[in-house]
Amino acid sequence: MAAKTERVYVPATFGMLTELKENGKLAARSGWGFAVTPALQEFYTEGDEEEIAYSAYQEAAMSSLRLLAIGDETDFPHRRVVISLDVPVECVHPQPDMGEAVVKLVPAIFTPEQLAAIHVDIEESEEATKKAVELIDAADLGDEDAELAVGDALDNFMAFYDPSELPFLVDLL
């Protein structure tokens, strides 16, 4: 019988995808991810499971902006990446004090076999993502114009890639 898993959305960068392809494993940055937790379900009084999961996914997409703001992504500094994983439930630890969807992954290392999907900003989204990366800190501090710019980036479509496409995505994009 297969172990019970939970879908976790991990914020990433394109460089992290390259590392996953080349090394066959990757650590979630600081062990953090986002998932449908009891706190997130409680937060939503309406909505189905898919809508609630999308909220966790969006949290990961916003966190990808923060990773890009660090400035160490060289290949695609203006493309968000979210990695969807299926992780054994015993490795997923909700952290409601950090946010309704926040989970700590222990261990934080995952392999390509755990991939459920890869999501990457499309080229047309790069300008909005660039602006959001520049303004993410101001948005966190309540600047309304910055919040709108971040919201515009989050509204942009992220392309879906099947886990089997990881090598091609890294080599051909």
Where are these regions (language model features)?
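Short, surface-exposed loop and linker segments with low hydrophobicity and enrichment for Pro/Ser/Thr
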Residues: 1-4, 66-79
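Short, extreme N-terminal leader segments that mark the start of a protein/domain
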Residues: 1-29
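Residue-level signal for threonine
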Residues: 13, 36-37, 162
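Generic structural signal for hydrophobic core residues of well-folded globular domains
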Residues: 21, 64, 85-88
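N-terminal interaction modules that seed assembly of large macromolecular complexes
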Residues: 24-68
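Short, structured protein-protein interaction patches enriched in aromatics and acidic/basic residues
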Residues: 32-47, 72-90
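A general structural signal for short secondary-structure boundary/capping elements
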Residues: 54-58, 78-79, 129
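Glycine-rich, aromatic-bearing surface loops/beta-hairpins
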Residues: 76, 85-173
